[in-house]
UniProtKB/Swiss-Prot annotation:
Molecular-function GO term, any one: zinc ion binding
Domain of life of the source: Bacteria
Protein name from the UniProt record: Uncharacterized protein YdaE
Length: 56
């Protein structure tokens, strides 16, 4: 049985098999600190949209 996860992009939330998920580092500001966090997405498009949503 394959484990399913939800896409990390908050407007998507599609279920994707963990083995097929695309893992990308999300770079964003947490207060005044720059932070990198690994997140799993269903597609490259969702990864790009999530990064754009967190840019200043």
């Amino acid at each position: 049985m394959t484990k399913k996860i939800k896409c990390a992009y908050h407007l998507c939330k599609k279920d994707v098999e963990e083995s097929k998920a695309i893992e990308r580092m999300l770079h964003f500001m947490h207060g005044i600190l720059s932070k990198d966090e690994p997140r799993k997405y269903c597609s490259e498009a969702c990864a790009e949209k999530d990064q754009m949503a967190h840019e200043l």
